[in-house]
Amino acid sequence: MLCREPRLYSCQRLKEAAKRQGHEMDILDPNRCLLKLSQNPPHFQIFYQENSGSKPYLLPDYDAVLPRFGTTSTQMGCSVLQHFEGKGTFCLNSSQAFLNARDKWKSLQLLLKTGVPVPNSFLSGGEVQAQATIPHISSPTILKMLNGSQGIGVILAEKPQSAVSIMEAFKQTNISMLQQDFIEEAGNADIRCFVIGDQVVATMQRIGQDGEFRANCHRGGKTEKIILSDDEKQIAIRATKAIGLDVAGVDLIRSKNGLLVLEVNASPGLEMIEKTSGVDIAAEIIDYIEINAFINLR
């Protein structure tokens, strides 16, 4: 497992599930990996340094790799994943799918291209004056940093001029922001689906604190059980496939025009959705790896 914080709930649950099913799992920090490319075989080698004073050693051949790195490690994490892919190792998820999911704008493009419904969204180039975007801004509107996570970098602007002021401020630090229609009828609630392969294995509704439009659990929101229709589940599965992921956390919102996909997460947390749904998602992931890594080895 590629993970920078092995003590996190999700990493511990996955390691425990693997052990219960008779597997050994190493947890590797992608930022401690050394990657080597060579014209002569073996073409792809990965070395690992346990700590700053130790000598890097050659990693063994693994049957499967499970990436669980955060947004700050996306570049190196995906480089390590690509190296494992070069070695022919089964990776859940692929490096390209990870990159697709971590780019908020690209993921929206991929979703809409494959017919998955998303909120009306807008992105302007760095040389476009923020004032010129006013005709395209809904009121109120949501502003999102392109690489934010856990609700960080998501801002509600009540009026178009407020949105312009916020964008101008962020532009000074070379941070681009996308705009999305605010789905007022959803209140401060959204839905998280956990998709593995062709199945939605768990769901939960997230509800933000009073006065907080973001429903993320990291922002103090609460969760409760929710049942989705088969059509709603299919939207979550289609969204996962559109990004190229095998395992994903898909965030949905119910609007007056139907269900919309807000985001597709490549490394979704397990804690709140396991505790809310009662589903052993960690075991489901290990089961999926067992089946697909075996096919990959044949």
From Swiss-Prot:
Binding residues annotated for Mg(2+) 2, in chain numbering: E263, N265
GO cellular component: cytoplasm
Cofactor: Mg(2+); Mn(2+)
E.C. code: 6.3.2.-
Residues that bind ATP: K144, D181, F182, D190, R214, A215, N216
Residue intervals of the ATP-grasp domain: 108-290
Binding, Mn(2+) 1: D251, E263
GO process terms (BP): protein modification process; SOS response; translation
Signal peptide from the UniProt entry: none
Pfam families to which the protein is assigned, alphabetical: RimK (PF08443), Rimk_N (PF18030)
Cofactor binding remark: Binds 2 magnesium or manganese ions per subunit.
Domain of life of the source: Bacteria
GO molecular function, one term: ATP binding
Residues the entry annotates as binding Mg(2+) 1: D251, E263
Keywords per UniProt: ATP-binding, Ligase, Magnesium, Manganese, Metal-binding, Nucleotide-binding, Protein biosynthesis
Repeat in keyword set: no
Residues bound to Mn(2+) 2: E263, N265
Family affiliation: Belongs to the RimK family.
Protein name stated in the entry: Probable alpha-L-glutamate ligase
Organism field: Haemophilus influenzae (strain PittEE)
